[in-house]
Amino acid sequence: MKKTAHIISHSHWDREWYMPFEGHRYYLIQLMDDLLELFATDPNFRSFHMDGQTIMLEDYLNIRPEKEAEVRKYIQDGRLVIGPWYILQDAFLTSAEANVRNLLYGIKDTETFGQKREQIGYFPDTFGIYGQAPQLLAQAGIRAAVFGRGVTPTGFNNQVQHDDYSSPFSELIWEAPDGSQVIGILLANWYSNGNEIPTDEDEAQTFWVKKLRDAERFASTSQLLFMNGCDHQPVQKDVTQAIKVAETLFPDVAFKHSNFHDYLTQIKEELPKELQKITGELRNQKTDGWSTLVNTASARIYLKQANDRCQTLLTNVLEPMCLLVENKSLHRDFSEYYWKLLMENHPHDSICGCSIDAVHREMKTRFEKVEAGATTFIAEQGKEIAAQINTLHDSEEAIPLVVLKTNGTSGKRVVRHKVAMKKIYFDEMDFRHIPDRLKEIVMPTYRLEFPNKGSVPIEVQDAGVRFGYDLPRDGFRRPYYARELEVTFSYDSDLYLGYECGFLVPVEEKQTEARKELIGDPSMNTLENEAMKVMIHRNGSYSILDKTTGFEYRHLGIYEDVGDIGNEYMFKASSDGVRYTTEACEASIRIIENNSLCATVEICQTLSVPAAADERLKEEQERLVWHPDRKAGRSKERTDITLRTELTLEQGAKGLKVNVNIDNTAKDHRMRALFPVERARGNHYADSIYEIVERPNTPDPKWQNPAFDHHMQRLVSLDNGEYGLTIATKGLHEYEIVSDSIAVTLLRSVGELGDWGLFETPEAQCFGQNEAQFVLLPHKGDVLSANVYVAAYDDPVEPTVIQTEQSMGPLPHATNLFQWSGEGLVLTACKPTMDGRGMILRWFNPKREGEALIVQSTHFLQIYRSTILEEQIEKLGTENVQIEVRPQEIVTLRFE
């Protein structure tokens, strides 16, 4: 059969990487100008693939808005191919819902520009891909995925080498854990195998002999794929002339300036009946381990933590809150703006922390804009909701507190909020005297009561005097000073999405009931609640006794420091091989807080480590020595690193909260926290995208890298069959299982980008204050059988508390939009539909068996099963529906 060579012109566009965004944008404008001219002058130049993303159009049209009609025309003609993504994201370091928003807004852009062509799941350079990608794509009607990494190893020089784990063909079947399948197209010869095609006959002869042979080696059909482009590659203007030369030299091959639509149509007609099936995540599991790029999970951890905060704000607070307000279009517009701004930080070279320092400084500003904007929006919209509620109380002195519950699950937790007991505005008296006047006020005793619950346990502390201001919608700003209280209360709610009003009521009688403090004997360095007992040791490590099982987890929280002579992409241990730990430290321990609802202990340790790598590392960096071949050790000069660890135990909590502050004074090193689980079994679990995946503790025999690090989203869990320990983190995405211990990376300090040149990155050393937050959750059995992952997902999402005035609003004291049940199911989305006509709820089932989902809502007329793109599939019922959620299935319901 005659071979067909499909030549697809493209440019893989890293929006920011070895230059800042604006530097790369200059060349994007050149590329697009040249491309539009080529479309106009060369009718044989059929199409150009815009790297699977739509943000490139925004970046271009912001500079050249007059080109929009021309761009739109070529998109509608099928010559300029965009989407389906808004940006080419890193798959593992962005949340499940962020991956879906990326697809939603990308598809919306393609429809806005009038693109009619079917989409492909495009992952040309993604640093590994989550296992549920086939299910997500299939639910969006996308039946093929193109990817360059994850099955065969890829080096920093962007060359892919064949490996037995990959399919023998470029074409394969990729299956998600739930059984969903897509056709997988492996870019086995990388996304530049047809780059810069010669027009000179002699050069073309040499070029095509090699390229055709390489492509035929992996092709299961007569259709051969050649990607005519590479990173930031200018469009090849004479590619159609080069094709004519090739046709003359190789008459037995049909050379075609093509696109993915035509290529996929052709190969589907010829695919063999039996293709290799690859199931689940693609992480280079069976390679030598040196080119996985997994340690981007720990480069510049501060970026990952900011991203986690922003994703949580948008997914778990701002979007659900939209369903409680009248002006849903305002919410929808702000939500899209904040999501798109946040996703500017989600390309792999951005969120992975593997770019030059200037790129990541700009990222910090974007995160700050999203966080500040979303926080303001939530606060102001919360005030508008609160102003509509009936907040009258028998006592005129009662302070109404509206609790907005937006996480979509019921449950109990300890809530902390600052309340203005008394405000004095600057227009009421001379501002210079206000603080003293406020300090004279005697703080009364308070109780907190809810109309449907009565009084709840509460702790109140004087928080002093604070400056603030109001911004009335119909007037000039009003500055004030306020006397504040810090109110901590136990909140047990059966709300899923809604609000209820509580009242902070002053009472004359003093508290007489004795409340048991969580630290009974301060000299014993022990915290204890109903579920666990925490014993702190002299070296600063601690043990947890799970009171429900009687199992003790010993010597948790020892810190380990080793040299790192790698780069932003990959960790490489220094050649000295020395581990420095806090095991022999003498820690200082002090109580920060101790009451009936919450206790916090601070542990302070000093660890002496080498100040940097030795001078050999500089030489190896300058000579571009590949990281596995480096031999540098650590310097003789020493420096002290101060670690401050806060352990917090709350009433009723099943987990111990840990906050670590590292004052980093060293370079070229990695610091981890160690959590042993005695007699751990050979596999463990980690949170991924719509999946809790099971992974082996030890690598495949082909693995040569001494380190076997992994990605996680929210949690990692290790058990011994009877008892387990789950660690739920906030923005910590790297771990390793080492000798029956979970090692969580808290800090990684390196000084260069890596890859194809020498790009120094001194800010990637992360000097100064570094924070890490996580929760330790002991349990019986494994993480799935114990359902402990539900608490892990819920931990970052706190209720929003709004202080308001007493008023006779039209809304009742409490409202709940829906309720649901389904043991072990995880709710990931609670948002307005993109078209503004209803509500979207999404769950996934992490378990290996099916589960019934029951949903009730009296606020909507119809309930539909929906695609991931929020399109109706079938009507399920009205107020009450029950469906079966298959093992590891993602389910989306649409309410109208």
UniProtKB/Swiss-Prot annotation:
The active site is at residue 125. Keywords: Glycosidase, Hydrolase, Metal-binding. The gene is mngB. May hydrolyze 6-phospho-mannosyl-D-glycerate to mannose-6-phosphate and glycerate. This is Putative mannosylglycerate hydrolase. InterPro entries: Gal_mutarotase_sf_dom, GH38_beta-1, GH38_C, Glyco_hydro/deAcase_b/a-brl, Glyco_hydro_38_C, Glyco_hydro_38_cen, Glyco_hydro_38_cen_sf, Glyco_hydro_38_N. Pfam families: Alpha-mann_mid (PF09261), Glyco_hydro38C2 (PF17677), Glyco_hydro_38 (PF18438), Glyco_hydro_38C (PF07748), Glyco_hydro_38N (PF01074). A divalent metal cation binds at residues 12, 14, 125, 348.
